Amino acid sequence: MSYTNTKEETQIINIENNDIKKRKFIENNNTNNNTNSNTNSNNKNNNNNNNNKSNNKKQNNNNKKPRLKFTYDYNYKIISPFQKFLDYGICPTLNELYSEFYHILNENKCQKLKMELDELKKMNKGDKPIPIDFDPSKICHQHSKEDIEQIIFDPNDRHLIELAVRKFCGFLQKESNMVLMEMIILSIGLLKSIEFLHFTLEIERDGGIFTTVIPKSSPNTTTTTTSTTTTTTTIINDDNTLITTKDSNEQTSSSSSSSTAITTNTNCSNSKSSSQPITRRRTPGGVFYKLINLHIPTEFKSNLFSISSLFKYKNERKKKGFGTLLDLKDKLLDFTSNNSNGNNDNNENSQEQINSKKFNKLLNEVDEEFDKLCVSSKNEIMT
């Protein structure tokens, strides 16, 4: 026996079903609204976090790259030895280097510099160009090494250290081995570092340093060259003099892979070569580092010029904010007094003798550990 709902019961059931559907619809809408609101709030939070991160990055970048306002002043560039070096290749004097580093490391403390900049601004008032015949040296002052000796680096103050390192690297054609540069400045002192920088710039002005590199090959490999026309052979002696010989007859020359002879042939009919010497010019940074390397006693060289010491210093600086280094200010060798070739009465002549011959020979000597540091300057550990 089946039971059939009456009309009233059916209406009541339909109303209840409709109410249930409405409640479900409302619940679903509320859920969706809550989800959307949560999503929007999360998106806003993410955007805010991203903005905060970008702002923090900008602040960190500004902190990492300290800038001096006056060094970007047009008037300062007129009298800056560094700017004259960049624009015109003029090698600064030692006193000019003292002045440049004193000014950038003593921002807003040199009253004479402020007065000079004010005077230049008056001359350049109304955006009128300064006369071409203007001589900046008329109003420029210079600082001495006594002023530089008063500058003391605080290991916890990265601002001054980075300013000095960047200025040194700028003079050395944007040298990229900045960690090694920092180690040198803190170890041998700012004054000695500036003196070596001046020495390097003088060497570059006079033509630079060229090294002869012989590629590695098997010890039994020989070089045989047969020529039917003119053959020119240039041999580099130990004293860096050149001996040139010419032979128009047919000849055959044989040399081991360690030979320092550079042979140039025209119209060769039969040539078998393996390891020919390659002449390369050292970078200004390489000359600077090599000069310091030569003046450090052998027992202390590894404290600066080695991969292990470089990693050690960088890791210490990362953990503690600074690294430990030996104080080598009073341990540097003096080549001038020890190698004056018996001419002690005239220091200028002996210095010129050392510049042109002694260091040219010493800088060409191969030091594998040192060359690794120079060649690896593009590596991450050097930046």
From Swiss-Prot:
Lineage: superkingdom: Eukaryota
Amino acid composition bias (Low complexity), ranges on this chain: 28-63, 242-275
Residue ranges of the region described as Disordered: 27-66, 242-281
A Gene Ontology biological process term: snRNA export from nucleus
Disulfide-linked positions: none
TM ranges: none
Designated name of the protein: Uncharacterized protein DDB_G0292662
Organism: Dictyostelium discoideum
